[in-house]
């Protein structure tokens, strides 16, 4: 069985980590640098940093904060937000990121996935997809979940993998911040065909949700969460201990 990863997510706006429900109602949580350092020591396998309003506000992301975060962490760091060109990939990787997550930028210009994969390798290219149920199907949303693209999420993910994305982060808007469990149906649909690692995002409320995720969707590679880790409702060390006791392979 593949070793499962536990990944805290830092959603950053105006230089501060924030949280919300269903991608709305954002409230301030903490400093991204402080949280990044905490999670490195807490046993997180990786860290994801999203500048969540960069695309919506049509600006570059906060590279100064990324550099500071990268200096503090000794685990793989994925950075996203406002990634619209291959030059943006270059800028973020030079700040110390290990992987770059592209979302709205790839919707506007799908060729960015293949171009970045060719230049930096697929292992550096993460396709982040914000998906929501619309009329019985999974639909792709852009600009931080604000804009319905009309695109079928499963087809978009399939296309992204074929273009060179080396990893998928699947964010379910329906379950985001609700803390009632991951979107298992959506994850099963994606993992049924995905040939690259899939990270589940949106909905974690307790340790049991992670156990259910990994036991139900066996092909999912990692669980990503924000608020339950930020507010210490779930400690990563405790989570990993419980996962191991339930027969799920994790790095302790």
Regions found by a protein language model. Name each.
Residues 11, 39, 47, 79, ...:
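Conserved, mostly hydrophobic/aromatic
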């Amino acid at each position: 069985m593949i070793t499962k990863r536990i990944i805290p997510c830092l959603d950053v706006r105006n230089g501060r980590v924030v949280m919300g429900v269903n991608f709305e109602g954002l409230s301030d949580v903490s400093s991204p640098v402080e949280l990044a350092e905490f999670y490195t020591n807490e046993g997180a396998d990786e860290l994801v940093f999203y500048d969540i309003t960069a695309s919506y506000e049509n600006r570059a992301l906060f590279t100064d904060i990324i550099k500071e975060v990268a200096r503090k962490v000794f685990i793989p760091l994925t950075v996203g937000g406002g990634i619209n060109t291959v030059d943006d990939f270059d800028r973020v990787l030079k700040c110390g990121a290990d992987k770059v997550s592209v979302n709205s930028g790839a919707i506007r210009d799908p060729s960015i996935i293949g171009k970045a994969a060719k230049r930096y390798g697929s292992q550096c290219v993460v396709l982040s997809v914000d998906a929501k149920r619309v009329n019985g199907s999974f639909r792709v949303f852009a600009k931080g979940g604000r804009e319905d693209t009309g695109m079928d999420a499963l087809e978009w993910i399939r296309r992204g993998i074929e273009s060179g994305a080396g990893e998928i982060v699947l964010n379910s808007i329906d379950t985001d911040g609700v803390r009632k469990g991951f979107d298992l149906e959506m994850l099963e649909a994606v993992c049924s065909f995905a040939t690259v690692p899939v990270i589940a995002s949106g909905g974690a409320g307790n340790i049991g949700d992670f156990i259910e995720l990994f036991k139900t969707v066996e092909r999912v590679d990692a669980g990503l969460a924000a608020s339950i880790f930020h507010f210490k409702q779930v400690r990563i060390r405790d989570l990993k201990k419980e996962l191991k006791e339930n027969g799920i392979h994790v790095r302790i």
